Amino acid sequence: MIKKILLAILLLPTLLYAQINTERVMTIARNALYFEDYVLSIQYFNQVINAKPYLYEPYFFRALAKINLDDFQGAEMDCDLAIQRNPFVVGAYQIRGLARIRQDKFDGAIEDYKTALKYDPENVVLWHNLSLCHMQKEDFSSAKEDLGKLLAIAPRYTRAYLMRGEVNLKQNDTIQALKDFDTAIDMDRYDPDSWAARAIVRLQQADYKEAESDLDQAIHLSVRNSGNYINRALARFHQNNLRGAMSDYDLALDIDPNNFLGHYNRGLLRAQVGDDNRAIEDFDFVLKIEPDNMMATFNRGLLRAQTGDYRGAISDYSRVIDEYPNFMAGYYHRAEARKKIGDRKGAEQDEFKVMKMQLDKRNGVTSGGNGKDVADNNNGDSGQDSSKTRKKSDKNMENYRKIVIADDSEADQRYKSDYRGREIGRAHV
């Protein structure tokens, strides 16, 4: 009994010392957070939580540190604990909303932002993120409503016009989208995103000269954005400025060496101007990224045949035919390559296959694939539609010569990078 009393007396100063210094430890932790030493700040916040687990602040700030370390689940859990201790902290809902977004929990994020807006109805960042969540869920009517309220609060907030323009584009209302982008440019002529956004509309309207002009402005204001060079290359391509387009792809790849669209499209353009060996290099790179890309494989096969590598060409054609057994152009070009290496039997087999597919087509027998009528132009390629481009997800082999543009789902990724909230910490630290 005496030993227990003595032990308690000895421990009492230590416990009192820990309690007295909790505020100091909290200050050190917040300073570490301010200077972006997130791991160190978490260690100090842990000490405060161990000493005073009933406080909301250490959980809130630890969540902020965790979200900056991409520990989104941990950040969400800490925000839960902070909100349990104080349900009126707007920042906790904001950070939890951001953590949920990064985990694709958009419904939960929307709930958080709506709750936070009850306490802070004029918070621009909350309206911004709420709008983007609705856009991500393709609830465009709600997104428009959010953006209308945001603009009522902050009528000169150019991001809102850009986002509403994006919504209008999703709803195929290019006229209203153009008006929003025009407004954003009028308000801030030094925002490269506004020029780039309007250029997208002009590309869709086939107004390629004006699109190029807008992208010139965007590039002047932001020279390290590879996407602007990719888009300007597309505008130049449609104006038959192939050299200018290739130059833009070069610049885009200097910034982003792994850019799929840059390598694939530059390979196509290099092939068009006879720069076959360097075109092969581009398609080699594409196939390192996407080994099963049959359009890149077929284009490389054509280039290998053009440069005299007939066996390499046959290998590429055969891979494509294995994947697309009714692709007539594959048999035609493989027959030509087999003739070059003296494989008459193999060439005759491929030619017979082409003839049979032609007869089946004329007799109305469908092969269930995407076969082509070699008679159209005597090289195994059918007449293609008037479009010069295809979406990246388009797997129709007939479109193998078309310039590739990004899928809508890839364009949507910019929404995810435009959410706001991590900077909240500096306002509180």
Predicted regions and their residues:
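Register position in tetratricopeptide repeats
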Residues: 34-35, 68, 102, 136, ...
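Eukaryotic alpha-helical solenoid repeat scaffolds
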Residues: 295, 299, 305-306, 312-315, ...
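Helix-start (N-cap) detector for alpha-helical repeat units in TPR-like alpha-solenoids
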Residues: 21-23, 56-57, 90-94, 124-125, ...
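N-terminal leader/linker segments that initiate helical-solenoid repeat arrays
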Residues: 16-73, 77, 84, 368-376, ...
